[in-house]
């Protein structure tokens, strides 16, 4: 789970050229001043009051956001949430696990950031359409079968940056239909601006991963002293 306290001071990044953290707007006395956020295996993001356990009524629809929105054909077993949401400033970031080696047409691996108070989507990073931060138009979907981020992510508040471990595209051990962007983001560490979702950089660890290696763990953030 992730935790957010709307009454606590809001820390801003300290590194130069970092985007500011968006203020959290919550009326005094409203419920869910302290809230817990979790996701479910059937594709929901849920916010509850940390003191009472009640749903946060101002978050999404009755405290829930449908994470299958924009994914197209997505049976429960094809798309699941296998890691906790990440609290990055006032943005809740979620990835998702796409089932391995099922078929070539699978849900996309979009990564999304949501307002911690309202549940409104702030941005989407679609590995198959990385310049567009918006939800797909009605009748359209995020690009299908793209690399996904199913393992835990990391957040550096000093830079307001999210670091994501990326998996491979579908189908994991069959590369014939992979695009140039699949080859760019598969099996890589991806750094995104937590406020905007814009890409900062990407570093690939395995080129054309045909072994389903993925990056299966949370990136570690370490400060080194330079002589």
Task: Give each language-model segment a name.
Residues 5-16, 45-76, 110-143, 175-215, ...:
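Extracytoplasmic/lumenal domain signature
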Residues 1-44, 77-103, 108-110, 142-178, ...:
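Repeat-blade elements of multi-bladed beta-propeller folds
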């Amino acid at each position: 789970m992730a935790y957010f306290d709307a009454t606590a001071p809001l820390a801003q990044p300290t590194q130069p050229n970092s985007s500011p953290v968006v203020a959290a707007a919550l009326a005094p006395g409203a419920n869910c001043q302290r809230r817990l956020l979790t996701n479910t295996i059937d594709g929901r993001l849920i916010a509850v009051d940390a003191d009472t356990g009640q749903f946060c009524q101002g978050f999404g629809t009755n405290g829930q956001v449908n994470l299958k929105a924009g994914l197209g054909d997505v049976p429960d077993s094809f798309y699941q949430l296998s890691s906790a949401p990440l609290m990055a400033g006032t943005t809740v970031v979620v990835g998702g696990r796409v089932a391995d080696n099922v078929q070539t047409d699978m849900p996309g691996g979009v990564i999304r950031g949501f307002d911690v108070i309202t549940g409104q989507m702030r941005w989407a990073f679609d590995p198959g359409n990385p310049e567009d931060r918006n939800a797909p138009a009605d009748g359209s979907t995020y690009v299908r079968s793209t690399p996904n981020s199913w393992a835990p992510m990391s957040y550096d508040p000093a830079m307001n940056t999210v670091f994501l471990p990326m998996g491979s595209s579908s189908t994991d051990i069959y590369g014939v239909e992979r695009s140039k962007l699949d080859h760019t983001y598969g099996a890589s560490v991806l750094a995104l601006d937590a406020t905007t979702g814009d890409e900062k950089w990407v570093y690939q660890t395995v080129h054309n991963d045909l072994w389903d290696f993925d990056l299966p763990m949370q990136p570690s953030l370490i400060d080194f002293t330079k002589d």
